């Protein structure tokens, strides 16, 4: 009885494996029907679609930031520099979008994904906050030349930050700001 079941199960499994390949062979060999065109790999198309969505999202965030009240509240010259940096970042994103649209392999999309991953929109938000702190301390630091030097260095370093700047670059700006605050704390104490 068990032998019969095993033989039957083997026959069914073999038929299940052979039937689809036999149908596929007859489908290709059918005369009169044109062969189906080859489609690009679905993974590349899906990766490209997701990359384009991610790029559009980052571009939208940059657009909102450039017209935000936080940026508009900065001093005019500082605001112009921050908006210029954001505009440059948006141009870089447009170049990346063109690269992604032209990508035809997984290697290309991986390289674009890596470049997009290193693109940090939040750097600009951090820059705005740091510059606002610098502007808030400038009046109190007017009498202390050492603090003024640190604040000027912090503002200059902050305005050099781009979307691809590292966290170490941001840390340098914060260190200048902390040094200025420490200098102000030492003079008032």
Where are these predicted regions, by residue range?
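Secretory targeting and sorting signals
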Residues: 1-29
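Mature extracytoplasmic/periplasmic regions of secreted or cell-envelope proteins
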Residues: 24-189
């Amino acid at each position: 009885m068990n032998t019969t079941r095993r033989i039957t199960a083997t026959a069914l499994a073999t038929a299940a494996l052979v039937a689809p390949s036999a149908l596929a062979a007859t489908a290709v060999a059918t005369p009169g029907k044109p062969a189906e065109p080859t489609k690009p790999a679905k993974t590349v198309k899906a990766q490209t679609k997701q990359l384009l969505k991610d790029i559009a999202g980052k571009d939208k965030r940059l657009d909102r930031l450039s017209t935000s009240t936080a940026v508009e509240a900065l001093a005019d010259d500082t605001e112009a520099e921050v908006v210029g940096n954001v505009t440059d970042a948006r141009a870089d994103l447009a170049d990346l979008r063109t690269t992604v649209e032209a990508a035809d392999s997984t290697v290309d999309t991986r390289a674009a994904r890596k470049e997009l991953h290193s693109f940090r929109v939040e750097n600009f938000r951090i820059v705005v906050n740091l510059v606002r702190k610098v502007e808030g301390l400038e009046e109190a630091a007017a009498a202390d030349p050492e603090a003024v030097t640190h604040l000027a260095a912090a503002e200059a370093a902050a305005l050099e930050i781009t979307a691809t700047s590292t966290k170490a670059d941001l840390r340098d700006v914060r260190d200048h700001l902390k040094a200025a605050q420490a200098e102000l704390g030492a003079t008032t104490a």
